[in-house]
């Protein structure tokens, strides 16, 4: 699924990685898109903001893969530029997603984990989301990244989720029972976003 080597990973670590991948996927495909849709709507661009966000995320993944290609590697400068642009574009959506998780989960624990542990992740934007998720659910996230599987003829591939530099975040050991809690957290956040969109639409119509 994620092209990583999980052959010698304990069960709890596999559960942890599934939670991390799933939460980040929900952000990149749903909540980040909604955030940029709202930004685009406020700027009078309609749904262009949502399209812009998805294209930016895709471009970053594309150039990251091209950088590792053995036959036609891309320019390292271009890859760095795409990564830096993505960090800027994803800065606000990552924090709106983390705030949404905090509102529908354990607010104080999520904010505390956000403030104290987000910086321990190599990717600060992903770190904000994962730290807030860990606090909102009371589950232990973060730790060593899985080793990616390189395609034939390609060099090492960067990990999809950056690991924590040191110990894991505090919380319960990840279990399969946490999957239903993650699903509930995501659905409650979707409902929160829908409510926000309804309020924005009413404000626009009545204003």
Each language-model region and where it sits:
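Hydrophobic N-terminal alpha-helices or hydrophobic patches in metabolic proteins across all domains
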Residues: 1-207
């Amino acid at each position: 699924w994620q092209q990583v080597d999980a052959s010698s990973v304990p069960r709890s670590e596999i559960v942890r990685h599934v939670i991390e991948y799933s939460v980040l996927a929900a952000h990149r495909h749903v909540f980040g898109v909604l955030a940029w849709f709202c930004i685009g709507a406020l700027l009078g661009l309609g749904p262009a903001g949502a399209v812009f966000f998805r294209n930016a995320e895709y471009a970053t993944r594309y150039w990251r893969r091209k950088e590792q290609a053995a036959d036609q590697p891309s320019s390292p400068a271009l890859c760095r530029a795409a990564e830096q642009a993505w960090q800027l574009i994803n800065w606000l959506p990552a924090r709106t997603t983390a705030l949404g998780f905090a509102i529908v989960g354990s607010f104080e624990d999520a904010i505390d984990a956000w403030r104290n542990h987000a910086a321990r992740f190599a990717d600060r934007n992903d770190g904000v989301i994962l730290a807030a998720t860990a606090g909102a659910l009371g589950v232990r996230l973060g730790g060593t990244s899985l080793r990616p599987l390189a395609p034939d003829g390609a060099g090492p591939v960067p990990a999809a989720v950056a690991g924590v530099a040191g110990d894991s975040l505090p919380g319960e050991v990840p279990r399969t029972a946490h999957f239903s809690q993650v699903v509930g957290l995501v659905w409650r956040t979707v409902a929160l976003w829908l409510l926000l969109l309804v309020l924005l639409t009413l404000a626009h119509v009545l204003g």
